[in-house]
Amino acid sequence: ENQIQTITEKQTETIRIAAYASIAMFWMPEILYRFKRICPNVDVDLRMVDHALEPFELLQDGKTDVIFASRQNYGKCEWTPLYHELLYAILPKNYPLNSRTEFPLKEFEGKDFLMPYGRFDIDVHAAFEKAGVKAKEQTVYVDDETVIRMVGKGLGISMMSELMIRGNTDDVCCVPVAPKSIRELGMGTEKGVELPESVRKLKECVVEYTKGFQGRKF
């Protein structure tokens, strides 16, 4: 009877994951495919979030087991760095770049800036503060793709990370900002807690998968 109960528990084990929408879209399908091959009896409950701080809040409240997000100031999180994303200026196609391959942060000064929703302003403001820049910010409560479309219609300019703009750049021009600005993406678990074997195996899949990103452009 105990053996049957143990088998049942193993079959119904679930890992709860909270991930940024961009990570859930572009990373998680391959990661979960690899994980399922080595842990077929472990279920995964994937929750997609659009707010930069929400994964950390869910982890802190015990509502998720693993998070995929950008590094934030949360002391109760065991953090594993995975990838450094470049930040890009999002500009209308007709913006006068004059053959430049980078966009100076100083050039955001005084321009109409469409601030992506979901507290991505944390990363934007960090870049602006280093450069001493003050843009004319307008927060827009729409998804990243809509912000990009708005830029394409000449309603302002913006700044986003690599994964945020992936596959949505036909109507705009995207160039890295200068000086180079990054946000660190990583995996987080509860601090000071021994990870179950299933989560350790998931972590191995994640680390192995993201190793292939070094030097790759999205």
What are the functions of these language-model segments?
Residues L97, K111-G132, L195-K203, F213-F218:
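Secondary-structure junction motif
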Residues D50-P55, Q60-K63, R119-C173:
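Hydrophobic hinge/microswitch elements
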Residues T14-A18, I67, I90, L114, ...:
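Short, well-ordered beta-strand segments
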Residues T8-E9, K76-L87, L91-F113, P196-E197:
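Flexible hinge/capping segments at coil-to-helix
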Residues E78-Y88, T139, E162-L163, D170-E184:
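Short beta-strand->loop
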